[in-house]
Amino acid sequence: MPIYPFQGKRPRIHRSAWIAPNATIIGDVEIGSDSSVFYGGVLRGDVGPIRIGRRCNIQDNSVIHVEREAPCILEDDVTVGHMAMLHDTHVGAGSLVGMSATLLSRSTIGPGSLIAAGALVREGAEIPARSLAAGVPATVRRELFAEQSAAFIPHAARYVDLAQQQSAAELALDDVYFD
């Protein structure tokens, strides 16, 4: 897996985290326990820090990047759907960022929120806790019920299990045969 230091900053990845073999992690990136970065994911901490909490999952082909000195923070139990783009944003614990959603610079997502698939969260936008935000640009559509917001935690837990299964299934090149 491509893991690169940048200007003296090295990625720090917890031993229990799983990084797909073709994910790329660069620079000032910290990834917490039981978190995962799936196939094609890119975390570029080259111009500022990226902090990924515990039990987070960054799904296939998602990109996380930052501007100078502005961090990108994912608190614990955050799910980032396939092909999402996060740019120096702060995502609260237990939130779900839908597939192909874009979170622009300095946006803040409150804990337990759902950012709908394809949504575009504007630069500097603040999405309150337990909100459903959708659209281009994203607007808060409604507050989520507590049980809806709580459902994102087991979703993140399922990805902990899936990452462990992926890790166990990896083959060395010597184990792959071609006809």
Where are these regions (language model features)?
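A cytosolic small-molecule/anion-sensing beta-strand core signal
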Residues: 21, 33, 39, 54, ...
